[in-house]
């Protein structure tokens, strides 16, 4: 009897050791905190691996990772803009992601890492939010380029400091050329109203300060969920037909090559791309899941109906060039 109890105690100890044999991981998080917290909790429940989130702005965290190099305490970089991977990849700071994991979110138009060292996880669409008590869909332009004209002077808000805006400038430059991109930026400066954040621009439309603004879709969906669509003045307009104004930008994750917990870090990225991970993410924030078997509870415009332009993954050079155009236009 004592021998049987000894065997049971030994088995229990072994199982306890097995359950806790994974190391904790640290994630440098530039994704919106509620989304990152939701997926981190879901991952902890699924695996028992504890996740510590070090949250901040994606660009600042990417710069910190470059400074820290192989001494970084980070295991994973989770960002709201895949463009921030460009410098890190070029510097050789990212570890390869398995092809099996990458293929889980590989849809038409979704950027793929040239070195297969990061993965896109969710999308957000550029949209025009407008005050439906002052404007209707027939007043909306067919191209985002037309909002930077005297017709819209004092009537269009924009946020030049957001990562999605930078991505839109990159797309404009690639699709239409530098001259068109620069003229658009100068037109916005001349005719538009500058706001510090997308949420502030949205609220300006709600408050009647400006009749329309260029923002990301999820800000409106989150506000609609909170207050009810019937209580909002604002509505969304989707530009579509592969116009730069229909751009979809993507969040993503990468494993740091310097991570001492490679297995756990890779497991976390695998989870983010899995059905359970995607469900946790899109339940917390109105972003587009990149898996066909996951549906957002926010009643989003169907991903395939966005008609977003297909633009190659942003490189470090693309980013630098877009920043120069923004600066040349006097927006920074």
Curated annotation (Swiss-Prot):
InterPro entries named in the record: Ferric-bd, SBP, SBP_1_CS
Keyword Metal-binding: yes
Residue spans crossing the bilayer: none
Main location, first listed in the record: periplasm
One Gene Ontology molecular-function label: metal ion binding
Keyword vocabulary terms for this entry: Ion transport, Iron, Iron transport, Metal-binding, Periplasm, Signal, Transport
GO terms under biological process: iron ion transport; transmembrane transport
Induction: By iron deprivation.
Effect the entry attributes to changing residue 284 to V: In strain: TN106
Gene3D superfamilies: Periplasmic binding protein-like II
Source domain of life: Bacteria
Keyword presence, Ion transport: yes
CC terms in the record's Gene Ontology section: periplasmic space
Residues where Fe cation binds: 32, 80, 218-219
UniProt-annotated location(s): Periplasm
PANTHER family from the UniProt entry: IRON-UTILIZATION PERIPLASMIC PROTEIN, THIAMINE-BINDING PERIPLASMIC PROTEIN-RELATED
Family, as annotated: Belongs to the bacterial solute-binding protein 1 family.
Subunit description: The complex is composed of two ATP-binding proteins (FbpC), two transmembrane proteins (FbpB) and a solute-binding protein (FbpA).
Role this protein plays: Part of the ABC transporter complex FbpABC (TC 3.A.1.10.1) involved in Fe(3+) ions import. This protein specifically binds Fe(3+) and is involved in its transmembrane transport.
Protein name: Iron-utilization periplasmic protein
Species whose genome carries this gene: Haemophilus influenzae (strain ATCC 51907 / DSM 11121 / KW20 / Rd)
């Amino acid at each position: 009897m004592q021998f049987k109890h000894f065997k049971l105690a030994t088995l229990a100890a072994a199982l306890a050791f097995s359950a806790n044999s994974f190391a904790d991981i640290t994630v440098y998080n530039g994704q919106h905190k509620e989304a990152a917290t939701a997926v981190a909790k879901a991952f902890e429940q699924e695996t028992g691996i504890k996740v510590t989130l070090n949250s901040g702005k994606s660009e600042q965290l990417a710069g910190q990772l470059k400074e820290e190099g192989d001494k970084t305490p980070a295991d994973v970089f989770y960002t709201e803009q895949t463009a921030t991977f460009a410098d890190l990849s070029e510097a050789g700071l990212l570890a390869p992601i398995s092809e099996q994991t990458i293929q889980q979110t590989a849809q038409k138009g979704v950027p793929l890492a040239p070195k297969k060292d990061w993965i896109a996880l969710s999308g957000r669409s550029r949209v025009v939010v407008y005050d439906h008590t002052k404007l209707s869909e027939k007043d909306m332009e067919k191209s985002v380029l037309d909002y930077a004209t005297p017709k819209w002077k004092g009537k269009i808000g924009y946020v030049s400091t957001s990562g999605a805006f930078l991505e839109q400038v990159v797309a404009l430059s690639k699709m239409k050329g530098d001259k068109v991109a620069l003229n658009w930026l100068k037109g916005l400066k001349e005719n538009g109203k500058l706001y510090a954040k997308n949420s502030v621009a949205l609220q300006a439309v709600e408050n009647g300060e400006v009749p329309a603004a260029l923002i990301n879709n999820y800000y409106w969906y989150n506000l609609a969920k909170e207050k009810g669509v019937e209580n909002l003045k604002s509505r969304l307009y989707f530009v579509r037909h592969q116009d730069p104004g229909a751009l979809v930008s993507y969040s993503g994750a990468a494993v740091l090559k310097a991570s001492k917990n490679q297995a756990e870090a890779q497991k976390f990225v695998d989870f983010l791309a899995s059905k359970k991970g995607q469900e946790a993410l899109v339940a917390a924030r109105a972003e587009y899941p990149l898996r066909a078997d996951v549906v957002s509870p926010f009643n989003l415009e169907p991903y395939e109906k966005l008609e977003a332009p297909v633009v190659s993954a942003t490189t470090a050079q693309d980013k630098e060039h877009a920043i120069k155009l923004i600066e040349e236009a006097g927006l920074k």
